[in-house]
Structures are given as C-alpha cells and as structure tokens.
Amino acid sequence: PFEFLMGSGTEAPAEFTFFLPDHHVLCMAEVCTQTQHNLLTPRGAEVRDARLWAKVIDEARVRFGARTDVLINSHNWPVWGQDGVHQFMLEQRDIYKYVHDQTLRLANHGMTIKEVGDALQEPDFASDALHIRGNYGMLYFNARAVYQKYYGAFDGRAVDLNPLPPEA
C-alpha cells in the first residue's frame, strides 16, 4: 500500500510525496532533494511558497519520519537510517523557513529586492549540511524570490518603473 501526502505548491503546482510502509521507504519526490531548490526558476514560473514548502516537509517528517529507514527523491541519492532521515528533513525544512522568515524581516526593515539577497547570510545550521548550501538554488536568489512573492519585483526606485531600453 501507499500513503500519500500532497505537496502542491512546493516544487510544482501539483506535487505529492508517498510512503511505502511495508518497506519503510519515504519518497519525497522533489520536495526534499540533495540540494536547495530555486524558489523562482530562472526559466520563469510562479514564485514557489517557501513557508508552505517548510510546512509540507515538516508534515511528512511528523507523519512518516519515525517509520522511515530510507528517504528517496526524484533526482539524487537516498538518505539512509532514521537518524539521517530525521536530520536531513529538519535541515531541508529549516532552510526554506529561514529564507522565508529572514527575507521578510529584512524587507520589513526597509531593504529592497536588490538588497535582501546580499544581506541574507548562510545560517549556522547550514555550514555542514551540503544539501542545503548554495548549489542549484541559493540564498541570494531565493531571498529575492520570497521578496517578489510578497512585495512584487519593484525595487522602490521610481526610475526603475519604466527604464529606458538598452542601446542597440
């Protein structure tokens, strides 16, 4: 049998994870992978919800974590053992929550979309967790995505509302 958990609005508009209880295997699809995802894809798409992403990871951890011996995902290598799975899911959850919460904190202190990415520093918990460090997705880009989700892409400078086109 399968046990499903909807994860729509995380990596994709329609996403789910599943648990195989007879095998103690949790498939997190692309919700938890061996990298930090982009919250806004460079190719263009709707900004992904970092707060929801963290919530879905935590819900999966609570529902399936104590029964999981192996975590698999769509593109990368597995995570083995309950302790490893637990730590992996906590770090994945925490990086999305950190980007979300700290970006809003910086924005509420008056920073623009161009400033939040540079101001957001890697959290201490990420120093030894290679799967959440900037590789595919990165803090700079994800902070700008969170800012855009809540405040739009406007940087607060009137001159940037209708800039002149680059010269040919």
What are these regions (language model features)?
Residues Q148-A168:
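Intrinsic disorder at enzyme termini
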Residues F19, V25-L26, T35, R51-E115, ...:
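Divalent-metal (often Zn2+) His-rich catalytic cores of metallo-beta-lactamase-fold enzymes
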Residues P1-R51:
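Catalytic core of the metallo-beta-lactamase
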